[in-house]
Every structure is written in C-alpha cells, then in structure tokens.
Amino acid sequence: MGGRFIVFEGVEGCGKTSQMQLCAEWLQSLGISVVLTREPGGTELGLDLRRLLLQKAEDKPIAEVTELLLYAADRAQHVAQELKPKLAQGKYILCDRYVDSTIAYQGYGRNLDMNLIHQLNDIATGGLTSDITIWLDVDVEVGLARKRGDNVGLDRIEQETIAFHRRVQQGYADLAASSPKRIIRVDGQLSKETVHKTIQEILSVHLKQWL
C-alpha cells in the first residue's frame, strides 16, 4: 500500500488541529499507519523557524520577503527529512498547512510576487503535491474569535488586520476554484462532529481508490 499525503488548510481558528486528530484516530481504526505533522515546525529545524515566524510582531519584526524565505526553508527541510521518506514507507501523512498556505498568506495576504512564491514552492517541495487538501472554510471573524477564546495569546500572524485575513480567505477560495479535484471545501462553522463526518465521507471515496 502506497503512502498518501493529506493536507488541512484554512484561516486562523478554522479547526484544523482538532479535525486532523479526529481524522488520524479514524484512519488508525481502519488499520492505516498515520503520521501527523505541520508547517512550519515539522522538523527540529522547523521548530526553530516556527518560533521566529510566529513570535509576536512587537518582539522582532520580520521583513515580508524574509518571512517568505523562512517558510520556504522550513518546507524544504520538511519535505526532505519527513514527508518524502514517510510516504516511501507507505505512511498516510496528515499535514497542518502546506504550499497553499504560502500562496494564501504571503501571496494574497502580503501581496508578494506570485511568480516568486511558485518558484520557491517548486524548489522547496521538489514536486511533492498533496493527494487531497481539506479546506476548512470559516468566516475570518469567527475563526479569530475562536483563537481569542483559547486564552493563549495571538501570534504574529493572528495579530494581523481583518483586511489581511480576508485577503487570505479570498486566496483559499480562488485556489479551491482553480483546483477543485485536489482542494475540497468543508464548512468549518458546522459542529465539530458534523465536520468530522463530512471529512470521513470525502476521504472514504478516496480510500476506495487508494487501498
């Protein structure tokens, strides 16, 4: 059985982390070997980069292009050290964010050059794309309200303006429209149980082809 790469995407507070965990437990109950990972931070180097990227904005300002390059460095290490080897072992990888996050956040949110972003993504991934991407779609204000309710403080990205987060949301909508077979929209504002059931139904269709 070959490995599969399943990515979870969405704006802040969309519920990716909890849905990934529920999905992992469900897949494991089917006898599938699952790996949970994330970007940034899927390797030891990535954890250091994550601390730099997500520290509060007032601590150490990061230039926008620097931010883009740090995300690319995190991804290149992640792909080489974790993703490709685990897929070669037949693992099912559930990943919290991947290339679409860079397009949505740095491309749409920061208005950085999209050609540069695609070039860096191509270099960092070595051509590795997701088998399927689950986009948990929530209104940005709902998502940010969820994050504030966590009582853990907002990180540098979460502290951005509503206008920034709305541009990111538009980025995801455009990506889903341009890649409807790879990116599947799920209404993230439904109950946790309903969202999980929807994801199960989506993946069940693919599992019939994969297993």
Curated annotation (Swiss-Prot):
Chemical reaction(s) catalysed: dTMP + ATP = dTDP + ADP
Keyword ATP-binding tagged: yes
Pfam families on file: Thymidylate_kin
GO molecular function: ATP binding; dTMP kinase activity
First-level EC class: transferase
Homology family: Belongs to the thymidylate kinase family.
Function: Phosphorylation of dTMP to form dTDP in both de novo and salvage pathways of dTTP synthesis.
HAMAP family: Thymidylate_kinase
Protein name: Thymidylate kinase
